[in-house]
Amino acid sequence: MTTSERRYHITTFGCQMNKADSERMAGILEDIGYQWSDDPNEADLVLYNTCTIRDNAEQKVYSYLGRQAKRKHEKPDLTLIVAGCVAQQEGEKLLRRVPELDLVMGPQHANRLQDLLQEVLAGNQVVATEPIHIVEDITKPRRESTVTAWVNVIYGCNERCTYCVVPNVRGVEQSRTPQAIRAEMVELGQQGYKEITLLGQNIDAYGRDLPGVTESGRHQHTLTDLLYYVNDVPGIERIRFATSHPRYFTERLIVACKELPKVCEHFHIPFQSGDNDLLKAMKRGYTHERYRQIIDKIREYMPDASISADAIVGFPGETEAQFENTLKLVEDIGFDQLNTAAYSPRPGTPAALWDNQLSEEVKSDRLQRLNHLVAIKAAERSQRYLGRIEEVLVEDVNPKDLTQVMGRTRGNRLTFFTGDINQLKGQLVEVKITDVRAFSLTGEPVKILSTSLS
């Protein structure tokens, strides 16, 4: 069977970085002749791009792998691949656990898939987890959307948060050059994409590893400089970035977001805990007072800006009073969106070895209480939209109501309204908001806007 007759399927777990990696690997496979299959059980190559941030995601991978391993006994020419963070963490141990695997590859090796696959097709079992310099990918990704796209700007993370496995599995920070990032965005603009999200595990660290400093001693290349550099890319209407770290978030960045017309008024800045002792134990490098100052400064420049974040409950040793400090921070700030999780011990992290682990019952109770408050505060934040006219970029049809389309406001609020997706996809539409929920809006279209800011 030639590659042009072979079908592939990729299942992606985890964060936006993983989704972007999967799109690049799909592009590589299609570049060498593979065809996409919606059904993994009909595919000749099955790739799981994995996440190890939470134990439940990791266990789900092993469940899926078990099914495909059985299938390989019936279909010996099936190529079975595990990529991503579980692959990096487990390495050769994965082959011992699932001997049917053909390739185990860490996230730094995503761009090398074609070369690694050649080794597999030559009859080898391959493990690629050694640290490498990430080279520019010349293969076009197979992107899920035709309207919005992710662009990686920095890989890896140099932080050492005591709960987080990311630095172990994604390696040290490696920034792409501004020229390479802009070139990719220019091509996306030419292809009709309207919105770009610049991605990094710690995007505020962008450029620290690139050569050059200014006369004042500042790094010559920063996220702020990058935003100014790419703001005028033709065809691109909106620019977002994620994920920010409070330790490196600057007022200069806020000013840039206010000044640059294409940069959306939405900030994703994880706080993880509202208690200073826990933040210190996590090695986050800031206090809750510093975090509040950042949010206050954003709202000073952009009062209507949307704020989203991440938070962990049940970190080892967390007392009820410390958890209530997190609740107080959420109450005081009022987030538009908050991604919450119960602490999950991860192999190779300091916190996993501590003897003051909390019970699953306590963690579950606190997670429910936090989520309840998050929904209340988000619903309160949504009220400000009622009756307003919002700019919405139409992305797709509403899968629950095919008479509606859906898109996002500049503040990243999911919005639904009646319309024909064939006419509106990729268009900026002014929508009058007639109904609000905690995390979504509904409205009526007012008019289609020009889709060229350049």
From Swiss-Prot:
[4Fe-4S] cluster 1 binds at C15, C51, C85. Binds 2 [4Fe-4S] clusters. One cluster is coordinated with 3 cysteines and an exchangeable S-adenosyl-L-methionine. InterPro entries: Elp3/MiaA/NifB-like_rSAM, Methylthiotransferase, Methylthiotransferase_CS, Methylthiotransferase_N, Methylthiotransferase_N_sf, MiaB_methiolase, rSAM, rSAM_horseshoe. [4Fe-4S] cluster 2 binds at C157, C161, C164. Residues 143-380 form the Radical SAM core domain. One of its GO terms (molecular function) is methylthiotransferase activity. Keywords: 4Fe-4S, Cytoplasm, Iron, Iron-sulfur, Metal-binding, S-adenosyl-L-methionine, Transferase, tRNA processing. It comes from the Bacteria. The keyword Hydrolase does not apply. GO terms for cellular component: cytoplasm. Pfam families: Radical_SAM, TRAM, UPF0004. It catalyses: N(6)-dimethylallyladenosine(37) in tRNA + (sulfur carrier)-SH + AH2 + 2 S-adenosyl-L-methionine = 2-methylsulfanyl-N(6)-dimethylallyladenosine(37) in tRNA + (sulfur carrier)-H + 5'-deoxyadenosine + L-methionine + A + S-adenosyl-L-homocysteine + 2 H(+). Its EC number is 2.8.4.3. It is an enzyme of class 2 (transferase). Its cofactor is [4Fe-4S] cluster. It is found in: Cytoplasm. Residues 383-447 form the TRAM domain. Residues 6-122 form the MTTase N-terminal domain. Monomer. Catalyzes the methylthiolation of N6-(dimethylallyl)adenosine (i(6)A), leading to the formation of 2-methylthio-N6-(dimethylallyl)adenosine (ms(2)i(6)A) at position 37 in tRNAs that read codons beginning with uridine. HAMAP family: tRNA_metthiotr_MiaB. This is tRNA-2-methylthio-N(6)-dimethylallyladenosine synthase. It comes from Gloeothece citriformis (strain PCC 7424) (Cyanothece sp. (strain PCC 7424)).
